């Protein structure tokens, strides 16, 4: 038996995968494979391996199979020199001479390039070699041993160590163990690469930004950030990626595949790492800690984003408006604001969104899903971050402080929005009307005014709302829920803002000042109503009588006079009222409630006006007196009216007959005589009247009352 034994070559330690086998490996296994191939090649160079004899490698690159053949060493006057030939299988006959250094660079480049630059499943071309398939799916090259008794062949190895190494592939044995974490490896080179993680060793440095890496493959992947290279393209949408693993994850978006399920809540994820990070929400584990402030996070990516808060680093800048961002994804989402692009569409209603997260949030509006529950009050939330913010309400924690006034806030976004009140900045502009807003959320809500969009419907009465909080407040009218209680008087309210306005009644605070007359109000709503006195603005007109009002609510109350509608009913006596405030005042007759107390004697009154009249007796205030006939008048407003009666001044003139009046109301009633207008109609006999008072007197005829 004759054995052909040659010097150790790269093929003796090479492990070759087919393209199908490579597809079964995950990202970590592929990286390990490339690092092992590089390590073996370096070891050969370190022991003085200078020639490849007749070894052949096949590389899969850009849909071409490259076959690299090492030519024999040629001697010349210039000394030893290695020449190689690169031959394309699909283009036979094309040759190119390469130096030894170029061979090394080519191998190193192809072995460590990302997943698409992988070794092909073609066999070594040396006659007498054949592959052996192992249980792990590895294809290992054996050298054949020629028998002296015929043409038969059987596998043999150059030495015992190679045979032992080969046997480990069949048995699945991993004889090299890491002392730090106990992880096992088949190759000593793989163990050495792994140990760099524990030692913190980073041998490979980026020339552009100086960032260091423990593996050369990680460096090459990182360099694509600077070059912008994205060699992995999605067949479905054409989107490019710098890593094959990112492309594989992206493919699942098109297929809808979510193989990783949470056992706690059943939520599914595309990637295993996403599931692991999600599970920490249930366990409360936060292994990633900030060295600056000690804050902990459940994911490394969240820690990295947080670290930029301390450094104030915002490396990604928008070319259109020069705004900077900490993350590239945030920059990409921001650019869509300028382009108007909304690539993520809701299948239910067709609404478009800039980022996928907004689409996920919107989907929960249709499904009603709220998986995160507060242990304190039982309230449910769609997102864990919203639950975290809500829990600060119970704990009272306000970690975000305004540098101008020191005010604390539950969330960072609230603090940013508040700081714009100091600067006056309103960066979010409406394209339709040009109105500016401090928050994007406010702009989104405002734009629904132009579109008329009302996504949120009340299940009780079918009324629609443009915002979910508005629907929530409306539903409390049906349920009667009033969760906000005043600690001073015990009065309850449906909205927190109503409670704040009410509390100013006790404190006497009036922070909203009129710029015209300096009068103060405890709510902005009351200030807005007052300012229409100065402007004279009355945009809401009654179609029945033409009377104008400054507010829609005032018009609604007025229209009930024409229709006779009295929707507010007293449960005690059945009497009905046109306004809710009238009902509340009336109910005090039955309850005996007297909330208005006299500061002098402590006497209680049902109405503020009666208390004011009573207090004048203590102060012995001289009542207002009519100068014409000496009649005492209690109210100041009545005094002004009385003075106009006796004065010659009648500023309101009728254009038809020239008759003058001291009040606009009297002129309006008089003009109905000329127009023949009778807007007040009796429902019993259809008789019409020009004044409401005349109608009320007439209705007494039907009920049998004597005025």
UniProtKB/Swiss-Prot annotation:
It is found in: Nucleus. A zinc finger (C2H2-type) spans 176-198, 204-226, 232-254, 260-282, 288-310, 316-338, 344-366, 372-394, 400-422, 428-450, 456-478, 484-506, 512-534, 540-562, 568-590, 596-618, 652-674, 680-702. One of its GO terms (biological process) is negative regulation of DNA-templated transcription. It holds the Pfam family KRAB. Residues 8-78 form the KRAB domain. CDD domains: KRAB_A-box. Belongs to the krueppel C2H2-type zinc-finger protein family. Interacts with WT1. Interacts with DEPDC1A. This is Zinc finger protein 224. It comes from Homo sapiens.
